[in-house]
Regions:
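Conserved, structured core segments of small domains
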Residues: 19-128
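Bacterial Sec-dependent N-terminal signal peptides
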Residues: 1-22
């Protein structure tokens, strides 16, 4: 009986490791967002653009809750400042998926923001 329990426990341990090895390891990426030239001038913002940026923010929150987004934020600079950028650190399996993630952002799709995707590696983090 002890042998049977031992063999069964080995089977289940092996099975659990086998399942982990089939998972695709996600890579870290950073999406760099910049405001398009038209919207660098705050006079060009309407309620429609404000609403789209609200959708952009809600999407980031939803993706954070799903474990895709690690963190997202923007520099505390005026929209008109050429150095102003937003950053999104997130997980994707490959460059294609990373680009799709950023290009499907409502602010990017509606040409309010431009997005660039770069491979990234988190070295130190307090994020959980």
């Amino acid at each position: 009986m002890k042998v049977l329990l031992f063999v069964l426990s080995l089977f289940f341990v092996t099975l659990s490791f086998a399942q982990d090895s089939t998972k695709v390891k996600l890579k870290e990426w950073v999406g760099v967002l910049t405001v398009t030239e038209k919207f660098a001038d705050e006079k060009n913002w309407t309620a429609a653009e404000q609403s789209i940026v609200g959708e952009h923010f809600q999407r980031l929150i939803k993706m954070k809750e799903k474990g895709i987004v690690v963190l997202a934020g923007r520099m505390e600079l005026p929209v008109s400042d050429p150095n102003m950028q937003g950053l999104v650190i997130f997980y994707a399996k490959d460059e294609k998926e990373a680009n799709e993630f950023m290009m499907n952002d409502p602010a990017v799709k509606n040409k309010i923001m431009n997005a660039k995707v770069v491979p990234y590696g988190i070295a130190v983090s307090a994020c959980k």
